[in-house]
Amino acid sequence: MRKVFFLLLFVPGVLQAQSGQEAARTANADVSGRWVVNTDFYGTTIYFRMELKQEGEKLSGNFDGDKLEGTLKGTSIYFLAKDEQGGTDEGKATFQGRTITGTVVFTHTDEAAHPETHKFTAELVPTRRAGTPQRHEFTPTTFYRQFSAANKPVLTISPGDSVHTTTVDAGGTDEKGVTRVLGGNPETGPFSVETASPGDTLVVHLSRLRLNRDWAESDDSVVGRALDSDLAVKMKDGGKTVRWHLDAEHGLATPEKPAEHLTRYAVPLRPMLGCVAVAPNVAQAAPGTGDSGRYGGNMDFNEIVEGATVYLPVSVPGALLYVGDGHAMQGDGELNGNALETSMDVEFTVDVIPGKRIMGPRVESATHIMAMGLEGSLDDAFRTATANMAQWLTDEYKLTPSEAAQVLGTSAEYKVSEVADRNAGIVLKINKERLKSLASAGK
């Protein structure tokens, strides 16, 4: 099976990025450190992660998660990494200062007779900036409709920094009712996060999600995944836009022109973000902002609210964080195809967990940890959510597979988060109270 590549070199004992130490570093030939490796795949830069440790002339570590061994002689580097299927990544390079340049030969088990050779340049990951975290006021003027690594960052921030900004609604309309951009979940961002590198986890804490206008729009239809043939016939005349009044003072939303039986119908406001995303691996075409996947995206999960923390796997340097698609509230699954779509006032704080590789989006609230699965079918989404949570339990709580199965079997709570878009969403939740009793919880 062909590997999907993103490379970052990580090694214990990263030296400070001080220009005066470059010559000394080369002379001492110390390649220990975290590196981002930019590899040229036919004109497209693909990013990799590697972790190296140097002991004399011996190198060890991992390359894109695969065990690596190699040598450093003078400024010449050789390494060989092997995956579990027998594929290899063989590199030859030269080291100078904070840069490694060379070639890497990828040999895949299913194409062993046709190895691929590509040039690369690797640079040390910058160290985390010292000092007090900053709060940034950002007024968006450009909104993107793809979760792309090619989009120019609108702002560069550091781990620990906060950003206060706004989003337009799914149709591209702002808080004043002015259409700013074509619809389709246009996003605010991307925000580049210093030190975030492939193989890390980006942490996004939503400290503020507030309505900034008094109306929203939705629909009067039900999406196809939720319809049987009889209900589809009954719903054939649906699809009309329904405008809702948002009463922030009383915390309620009501249809502005209610039909006969909805004249007293009101639902509680619970502002949320439908979209929180990082740029996906550039080996794939950039997805539109209506899509979702391992990178997050249009997840439409109604527990991504004020106070929640979202965890996303980083695939490109800087992570490139996007936010958008505000909902005044939404039922499970986003059954109308649109929730109560509205613009939003947003504040978030970012952090980076170096070297932590998670398989997909996760959310944490005051009471629960939540693992998401976003796939083409509900069955596949169910499996992915379960695997995502199992990884969380084994990595963070040090459970064995047997122990994880027992916890899942007694504590799992499943929610259908999304059925409106190409990918369906399932979320597996576990109450934190259940986890407090685990022997590893305090370690």
Model-assigned labels for residue ranges:
Residues 18-112:
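Central antiparallel beta-sheet cores of small beta-barrel/beta-sandwich binding domains
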Residues 356-402, 406-407:
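A hydrophobic, small-residue-rich beta->alpha segment in the mid-to-C-terminal subdomain
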Residues 201-354, 387, 394, 401-402, ...:
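Glycine-rich anion/phosphate-binding loop at the beta-strand->alpha-helix junction
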Residues 139-148, 180-187, 287-295:
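Short, structured beta-strand/loop micro-motifs enriched in basic residues and often containing a Trp
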Residues 4-12:
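Sec-dependent N-terminal signal peptides
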Residues 157, 193-196, 304:
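Short, well-ordered loop/turn sites that connect or cap secondary structure elements
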Residues 153, 189-192, 300:
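Short, conserved secondary-structure segments in the cores of folded domains
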